[in-house]
Amino acid sequence: SGTTLKALMNTSKINKDIKGGNKLLENWPKGAGTNETTLKVLLSTFGFQLESVQREAPVLGKIENYTVKLKRPENGRKSNYKHPIAAFGSEAEEKGFRVICLFGKTDASRLIDTFKEVGNAKHTLVLLDYALPLAERRILARKTKTDLSGKIFAVVDRVVLVYLAKHYTETAMNRMLMAVIMPFASYQPYIDKSVDIMPQEIFIGRKYELEKIESPTGINIVYGGRQLGKSALL
């Protein structure tokens, strides 16, 4: 109580990372909401490559609500996402995800009730201007898996914010964000039907073959039997 967010920062880091951590704190929605410009800076500092951030009508008439789309590479290549969460990666290039802002003291049960009211039309990143206690965080981890279905509700609260600001590393930030918030959310990233499109985030292996296909002087015919990964490579 009475301690500012900046006072909790680690001052032993290199200057560039200190600036990045400070930028997270400066653009965090505090009490009275945010706007498109500030949210763009915050999400970019979290490591998202943004195409657009669009303010939508408030959810339930009171909850700040934004639609975020990520940028596709202009050269036709695939984005190099450093985490396996397609909902906040390649899938968001086309479908986007939602950001909502919540303020003030709460608990896991109230959060789950709010998420149900908001609805599961989109995967949702929740910016919560409150520090969830550890016990409530554990309850939230359980309830997101038992009480919610279909879409992600991933919570970034003040605890997550300060942790990421103190350990800010520009090239690893998006991966760190996912590693910290996803254990307390529910998501099944794997594809169990071969007819479904495999997200690039979970395509592992075949690096040599992929490089040969992408090379201007490489191969231009891909062949093989059924279920051997031809479509995944392409």
What is each of the regions a protein language model found here?
Residues E91, K116-G119:
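A general structural signal for short secondary-structure junctions and capping/turn motifs
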Residues K105-A108, L132, P216-G218:
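Short beta->alpha connector loops
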Residues K105-E117:
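A short, acidic, amphipathic alpha-helical segment used as a generic capping/interface helix at domain edges
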